[in-house]
Amino acid sequence: MANLRIIKRRIRSVRNIAKITRAMEMIAASKMKKAQERGLAGRPYSEKITEVIAALAALPQSGEILHPLLERRPVKKIAILHITPDRGQCGGLVANINRKTGTFIMEQKVSVSAVVVGRKGVDFIRRIRQQMRAEFINLGDKPDYLDTLPISRVIMDDFMSGEIDQVFIAYTQFVSTAIQNPVLEQLLPVVPVEFPPGQNLEYIYEPESAAVLNSLLPRFVEMSVYHAILESIASEQSARMVAMRNATDNAKELIGELTLVYNKARQESITNELLDIVGGAAALA
């Protein structure tokens, strides 16, 4: 009987866990839809401003750097903007982006400092004892553009002051509900796009291209950071929904297995009791 009580208690415990994971799955699904809409809505603007900036940076220059954010210099120190969730329970997403950043840091032959978004990233950078320039946590599930400006400002100030010579950004790109890819890209200096020979850029700049570039470049960095954070949030909620769905399915499967074990144990217990009764009756006869 004691064994039956233990099994029954475990079934009840797993059933309660299944209720929790099911609720978390539904919450994540709701947040995922909103995060996907925000992330996908910003993609066209992000892609177009990237195209314009890259085209401007590719224009012939008269020996003078058009903007400090375009300056290329010998790389003595690198910064990486590492974007992760604040919370776990989202499958392998956190491990994948941390592994991407960790591998990148190990491969560098120069000093690397990290600007970290998300508590999971902060914990990781501290665990590997890497220099951390700044940390930003608790941005929430729906940060707006203004919430991310301090992150962009740290990066741009350090680059323009010469504290760092190159900036990379690591985040999780949303592909679909089931697929989220860890991505690592160069953010600064801006890499000019290579156009095929003879291709017309098809842009007429008013005022002159240098003025447009000076105005757009800071916005480009800010938008790139903001868009990467939105992509990471959409990926996080998608991964969490899938993880909680798998946890719920596993819990249901475990409940079925435990119920089968419970029924077999109960049947065995009843059979033993009947045998004891029959044996006792036979002894009295």
UniProtKB/Swiss-Prot annotation:
Superkingdom per UniProt: Bacteria
GO cellular component: plasma membrane; proton-transporting ATP synthase complex
GO biological process terms, semicolon-separated: proton motive force-driven plasma membrane ATP synthesis
Keywords of this entry: ATP synthesis, Cell membrane, CF(1), Hydrogen ion transport, Ion transport, Membrane, Transport
Main location per the UniProt record: membrane
InterPro entries: ATP_synth_F1_ATPase_gsu (IPR035968), ATP_synth_F1_gsu (IPR000131), ATP_synth_F1_gsu_CS (IPR023632)
Compartment annotation: Cell membrane
Membrane topology of the entry: Peripheral membrane protein
Record's signal peptide: none
Record note on quaternary structure: F-type ATPases have 2 components, CF(1) - the catalytic core - and CF(0) - the membrane proton channel. CF(1) has five subunits: alpha(3), beta(3), gamma(1), delta(1), epsilon(1). CF(0) has three main subunits: a, b and c.
Family: Belongs to the ATPase gamma chain family.
Name of the protein this chain belongs to: ATP synthase gamma chain
Species, as recorded: Dehalococcoides mccartyi (strain ATCC BAA-2100 / JCM 16839 / KCTC 5957 / BAV1)
Gene of this entry: atpG
